[in-house]
């Protein structure tokens, strides 16, 4: 098994790094436990800008329409940021300036507004963020999936236009399309939603996967043409086609890759799940998942490279691990961090992977 070394380590955060994300260009975004976001230039490997996006932990980040950055925080906010790189100078933030900015604590937002006129809030939606489940976004289906506002065991689907409407008042709740999506009673008690993933298949169907506290992985399907239907009865749009208790501990991450669905949990399993090919598929018609016992408990995050050939997991033991998507065979161990890894990301279209850790560092690696 290959044991590579990182080609660069980014140091700029003063608290645990909870989310990391590449855009399609030369930037890497990282978010931390204190709510700060740093935009790193991958050419110079230095921070281009930083601001306090949230007052609490950042749960997740996504690049949405027009290259805007959407961040989800535990302060119950889903915020879309407009970043005008054309107005930025060629100067970079020094690490001392970055540390000074982060030392402002709760008042840092006012300081970042003074120093970052090229960063502005485009939309600000009030959501449920009391769990650790980040939002999911699908550019093809143009929907956003979040935990239900009141019930942690249910999901709500929002129109992604909510992310682009200019902020008109403080308490914007977005446009909800379907609400209270949950497994059928036959599945039993599932507990809180821990992770979600959304994809479009065959340009006809939208697949929604959810991993639950009980260890269940559940998949729902709807037609692409009906996904924007506004209804109080989610069953008029979504159909549950798959439910399997694939983990003995809570599911920590689910991720679609083409026609495959992968999941990891607090146990030591990676699971490859079958996916429905049609809305005509019924519950129980799909085969059982394929399991790989890794002997490493607590795989916090899973991501698949854009070529769908390899996947990587973020481990509580401070290791990133690389596996084959086809066989789930282990390929490499990414060993550098002194504490658990919270998040990871593949650069789109390249062999670079970023690992974000509780030790406040971000390591960059090149894989084959």
Curated annotation (Swiss-Prot):
Gene3D superfamilies in the cross-refs: YVTN repeat-like/Quinoprotein amine dehydrogenase
Start-end of each WD repeat: 12-50, 53-91, 246-283, 294-333, 336-368
Source organism: Schizosaccharomyces pombe (strain 972 / ATCC 24843) (Fission yeast)
Keywords: Chromatin regulator, Cytoplasm, Nucleus, Repeat, WD repeat
Domain of life, per lineage: Eukaryota
PROSITE patterns reported in the protein's UniProt record: WD_REPEATS_2, WD_REPEATS_REGION
GO biological process terms, semicolon-separated: 'de novo' cotranslational protein folding; chromatin organization
Subunit structure: Component of the ASTRA chromatin-remodeling machinery complex.
InterPro entries in alphabetical order: WD40/YVTN_repeat-like_dom_sf (IPR015943), WD40_repeat_dom_sf (IPR036322), WD40_rpt (IPR001680)
Protein name: ASTRA-associated protein 1
Signal peptide: none
Primary localisation category: cytoplasm
Family assignment from sequence similarity: Belongs to the WD repeat ASA1 family.
A GO CC term assigned to this protein in UniProt: nucleus
Location of the protein in the cell: Cytoplasm; Nucleus
Function, in words: Component of the ASTRA complex probably involved in chromatin remodeling.
Pfam families: WD40
